[in-house]
C-alpha cells in the first residue's frame, strides 16, 4: 500500500487523535476524555500513543488478536483491571500482509473501501457510539427549542450531563458499545474485513471528526483531506453555537489516512 495523504488536526487546544504509520500498517486512534479521572491511567494524549505502539508491536494472527493483545499489554502496564473506567479510544486500522489486506474498526472511527472493479464503495463502521451521541444531540436540540438557549449551552445542563454519564457507563458492556480501553474483550466486537490486495484501489481511514464528510470520503477516487478539512472548519466557524448544525461541541479533532493499492 502507498500512503498518499495523512491529516491529524485538533478541534481544541489538545489534539486527542493520533496517527500511527508503519511499514505494513496504518492506524487512526481517536482518544476520549474520561468523565472521571483515574490516577493509575495515563492522560488521553499519552494513552493513544501507548495504545498504538502496543497494537503495532503485538503478535497476532489478525488485527482483532493484535488489538486485544495491545490492550492487554497496556492494561498490565497500568496495573488496572479490565473494567477500569477512564480513557478510551476508537480505532481504524489497515494492515497489508502479502496479498491480503485487513481493515479493522472499533468504536466511531471508520474506513471507506473502494474496489478496482467499480463495486461499492464499502463503509466499514460501527454505529453504537453514533446512536448514543445522536440521542444526546437530540436532547440538546429539544432544550434549545423549549428554553430558547443555544444548542451548545444545553450541553452544560444537568440533564444532558447525566445523559452523557449514563452513556459512558455503557462502555464495553453488552447492550452498550465497545471501544478500546483496558478490556481486551472489546477487540472481539470490532468490525473486521479481509480483502485480496488485487481487488482494492483505495482505503480511507478516518476519525469521527470527519463523519460529516463520509460521502465525499467514500465517493471520490482520491479525496483531498486538507480541502475537506478546510470546508469543515469553515462550516463550524459560521455556526459556533451549534444551532444550524447541531453537534456535541463546536469542533472535534479530525484525522484521516488515504492508502492506494
Residue map of PLM features:
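PP2C/PPM-type serine/threonine phosphatase catalytic domain
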Residues: 1-261
